[in-house]
């Protein structure tokens, strides 16, 4: 059975897409810690990020870097943090989170509740920053 991320990539479930290429897909986290919280996933369905080939793992991080630079331009911050957890969804993914301080990376923090229009504006701001 396809993961929720595979269904998002296939267009079966809507998302706020930020970027993609032939191997990777970036979209806004639907339960963001802060505005600009973005997920980067491989289009190949792989549960554990370290099960990716060395080539694909490196390419995923290069793609994530491009997305992170756009996130940082769209949402000025001290740094864009990167986290790999992967326990909730069995599909490898990288969280990119604009940070003013390390507390912005605490996944136990309350999640933002954004409207559809706010999500669209966030995604557009990141896309425009590429």
Where would I find each of the regions flagged by the language model?
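HIT superfamily nucleotide-processing domains
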Residues: 1-130
